[in-house]
Amino acid sequence: MNTAAPSRKKLLSLVLTLVFMLTCLPAALAVDLNVDAGFYFKQSRGGTCTLASAAMMLRRRAYFDGLTDWSTVTENSVRSTAWSNGLSHSFTYKEMQVGYATLPSGLQSKTAVLISLLEQHPEGIVFYDRTQPHAVLLTDYTNGIFYCSDPAGNIGYG
């Protein structure tokens, strides 16, 4: 009687199960950056929506990069390197570089550029509207909808 075959089948089954579990593990442990895991907050005072949005973006980038102190990225911690009577157009905070760009004219062109930027920068984009002087953190584009976090104190969700 051959008892080796059933043992090999059990061992192979166990190994395949472990391999399957290991391939699923990263997805199971991943945090969706669009779910609030402590990334988002409201601005500390009026007129700092750009600073608060930038701090949330940097907080998400720090988390994404695996920095354990990502939750210490706050409006106040970013202020000294990013703020001078308004958000600086370019600055570096904890080795994370932030730049400035202007969107092209035309809705389709703007949409295409924003989608491309979000693909390159999953931490998000600080989006400032000069006509409404206000900034939000643009975080995602899914199924034709842009998602954002609005730091304004009078906005409950968004």
Report residues per predicted region.
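Glutamine-centric residue-chemistry signal
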Residues: K42-S44
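Conserved active-site-adjacent core of cysteine acyl-enzyme catalytic domains
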Residues: V31-Y40, S53-G158
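Short intrinsically disordered, low-complexity segments
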Residues: S7-K9, M21, D32
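Bacterial N-terminal signal peptides
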Residues: V15-T23
